[in-house]
Design a protein with these regions (language model features):
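Gly/Ala-rich beta-loop-alpha elbow adjacent to hydrolase catalytic centers
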Residues: 205-209, 213
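A mature extracytoplasmic/lumenal domain signature
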Residues: 142-144, 207, 431-433
Length: 474
């Protein structure tokens, strides 16, 4: 059973659902964090932090910041629409749904009741080639707003965040109905008129949007004529967790918002380290980013009130990192509570920083550790236990510390180096083509052994002889 497996969908069905849910969630933000994401990747959180923040505001020639209408920016709104359409989803308009509430020019739906009017949600459809509606996607947006109303809408959402944590009883649990009760009724009627059931609905969201996902799941038996009781719910970075098993709650362990509440209740740990495991959540996935790696940044307390920790919360980091887990050759070996370290370093930090399990601001990690590299040139260091390491694309350097590790190289994986390889380690080559006999690919160069598959290779540093035991070529 894979780490994101859901209900009885099986591995492939669960992976397809996860990919759909992620595409819908990312679309709900309309690429709002595009400028920060690109600026962070180029400049990082060290000496390049000022340039990263400028990029977040003003963007660049290859990104759009939060300030709209700058002539040198690309159209990230257009890119967001193209991405969700490429994933198979198309926005459904208010007129199509027979809905008369507030909608903006993009087709985004806004909250209905006073106190909820800054909430936003997207409704999308998936169609076959003949134009028949197959599925409906509902994507709740997190704390933010359209670029032109970002400040006022974000303030309204922050009020909702505070009320969810500290306000009236059941505020968070009832959030979806209070904000979008009428719209969700229209969507249910529209779906039913097209021969769909609640099982054909994907509900997704991030941050405050993830809270809305959990809320809707908890209300699905009693609201909207129970239409959504069998829908599929995937929440990212949600501070809350539904009481039942309807929701898959996905987040980074070092995201200060994820699991900030215990169910729907706040406590002192909500404002500090909160790493209590929950049955519905992934509890040990780490975004190994510049903040997590930095001793200096971590001299400050881990807290939802400490803004630098929020780099682990941004939707683009979820889209990239979680998708690499989804695509990993180790996917089926990872369980809901496996320790998974995902490389999300900036380009400057990646050149000098070893990706590893630092176990910061969390309960002690148990069992095997999975380390998933990026598409760049990573430095990856295994621990003392049996680690599963996948460098990904790029020319990676991997340091072996235990002699009981499994290294996975898939497809066109680049030119990697393994330091400290031992005969008790396992090398797995997947989708590389050619002979399955390692002797057809290995040769000694100087004091190293190089295993090559076309233009891709692994250099076992300091290894001058090799046994075929523990080498798998598929």
């Amino acid at each position: 059973m894979g780490i994101f497996d859901y209900k009885n969908l099986g591995t492939e069905g669960s992976k397809a659902l996860f990919a759909d849910a992620m595409a819908i969630t990312l679309y709900s933000y309309h690429n709002l964090d595009n400028g920060f994401a690109v600026g962070y990747q180029h400049n990082g959180l060290g000496l390049g932090l000022p340039a990263t923040l400028v990029g977040a505001l003003l963007g660049s020639t290859d990104s759009q910041g939060v300030i709209p209408g700058l002539p040198w920016n690309p159209d990230s709104e257009k890119a967001a629409l193209e991405a969700v359409q490429q994933a198979g989803w198309t926005p459904i308009s208010a007129s199509t749904l027979g809905y008369t509430g507030k909608v903006d020019a993009r087709g985004t739906f806004f909250g209905e009741k006073p106190g909820y009017t800054t909430a936003q949600v997207e409704v999308l459809g998936k169609y076959d080639d003949a134009g028949t509606l197959l599925e409906i996607g509902i994507g709740f947006r997190g704390t933010s707003g359209p670029r032109e109303n970002l400040i006022t809408d974000s303030i309204g959402d922050l009020v909702s965040d505070l009320l969810a944590a500290l306000g009236p009883k059941d505020y968070a649990k009832n959030y979806a109905s209070e904000a979008f009760g009428g719209l969700l009724k229209n969507v249910a009627e529209y779906a039913g008129a097209h021969g769909l059931s609640g099982h054909d609905v994907v509900v997704s969201g991030h941050s405050l949007g993830g809270l809305a996902v959990n809320s809707m799941a908890d209300l699905s038996d009693s609201k909207w004529s129970s239409f959504y009781k069998d829908s599929n719910y995937v929440a990212y970075a949600s501070p809350t967790q539904s009481a039942g098993d309807k929701v898959l709650n996905v987040g980074y362990e070092n995201d200060p918002v994820f699991r900030a509440l215990d169910g729907y209740s706040s406590n002192l740990s909500s404002f500090g380290v909160h790493d209590k495991p929950h049955e519905s959540s992934t509890d040990n996935i780490v975004s190994f980013n510049d903040h997590y790696a930095s001793t200096l940044w971590n001299a400050l307390p881990f807290s939802i009130l400490n803004l630098p920790t929020w780099v682990s919360h941004l939707p683009t980091g979820y889209g990239d990192g979680m998708t690499r887990i989804l695509d990993s050759g180790f996917y089926e070996q990872m369980t809901r509570d496996s320790t998974v370290i995902v490389a999300n370093l900036s380009d400057p930090a990646r050149a000098t920083t070893w990706v590893q399990d630092l176990n910061r601001n969390a309960e002690a990690h148990q069992g095997n550790t999975f380390i998933i590299g990026s598409h760049g040139n990573d430095l990856i260091q295994g621990g003392k236990g049996a680690d599963f390491i996948e460098g990904g694309k790029g020319n990676d350097t991997i340091r072996d510390s235990s002699g009981h590790n499994t290294f996975l190289f898939s497809g066109q994986f680049g030119n990697d180096r393994v330091i400290g390889y031992q005969a008790t380690d396992k090398l797995v080559f997947d989708g590389v083509g050619g002979s399955t006999d390692y002797r057809d690919h290995a040769k000694v160069v100087g004091g190293d052994t190089v295993i090559s598959f076309g233009a891709d290779s692994v250099t076992l540093v300091g290894v001058s002889s090799l046994s075929g035991e523990g080498i798998v070529i598929g």
